[in-house]
């Protein structure tokens, strides 16, 4: 059982609490879905349950959080880890090994499990989490979605009674989300207590026993699963929530437009392994071009080639009909990465928005206001929530002055309202004549943005 007794939490350096007077109880075997707008306190709840904030968060906690009758603040983390398994929004932040098999078994090795026990746990994790083909691989050569599945397998292998998952679907394709749904169903069937913080709701809403809706750090309402699924469309949108049903990806269509970016016969490899070959497509100026595909298809590798961060083995990239070398690509292109933590360098949100840009302070503040970030202008970028960091990186791209903007999963961690704002902003950038390329699994975002899906699927791909 998990209890929150009038819990208020304020992060270090902040004056406004992230969580305010929050009280609830979760019984054994329940699957609870926490949802609400970006920054509403979902991740804070997750980190209070697994003890990360009480044991090193540096903030101020009022009230009490207990798991199985034990006060989390007074229980050592190593003991909590045997009861609570965690899967974070950014799985890289919880990895300790270079290889996938070692990562799945790391917790068991750390507590001195026998070889027989580890073999059984590895086989079970491979079956339940679908990571068999990913074992014995370099963990940093995996796609974002593949890393998320390894994180799920690592938590499963430890056999905890409570599982907390923070935006676990944020980097997954449709098939990966269905696999995640199966994992949640199996956890629930096994009698585990499961708590999921999510914006993407369609895959988990019907599995939830209850849905906790947060707004501005307060637990505003608790719905039964049936009540939540019955919410009218307008009510759901007014709450800032994403679709309760899956929105399929649009079919790809080759573009007949000229100008902008043209890719012909591109081939690339990563770590000595061929990723794809003979990739060709066009991304005209003045429209949003979407690159879709399953996890591990090489979409992020393609983005790195397009902006000159990675060298292709064969093929050509043209801009306005002229050959575009790697140096020129780096001059013209700006990449908003899938893991935005890798590109936030400023010591404040405002400083980050102006870094590498000619924007004035007023222009930067206006861009931050557009992305609902101006209130955090003096905060450190890494103190923001996942969705807020994502929006800040988008501000960086918009102020960069570059002609080719490449967004790798720009709606990861975004609620409905901010997803609409990003859609509107990208449409505006396209209207200005920029070339906008978006890598995404988000069908709802593609529908709202009016993006044209490129027919880029490689003729051959080697796993």
Model-found features: residue ranges?
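Conserved ABC ATPase signature
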Residues: 138-142, 146, 380-384, 388
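Conserved ABC ATPase "signature" region
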Residues: 116-134, 361-376
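H-loop/switch region of ABC-family ATPase nucleotide-binding domains
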Residues: 198-199, 440-441
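Conserved ABC transporter NBD signature motif
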Residues: 58-70, 315-329
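Catalytic Walker B motif of ABC-type/P-loop ATPase nucleotide-binding domains
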Residues: 163-166, 405-408
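ABC ATPase C-loop
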Residues: 155-156, 398
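Hydrophobic anchor residue at the start of the ABC signature
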Residues: 152-153, 394
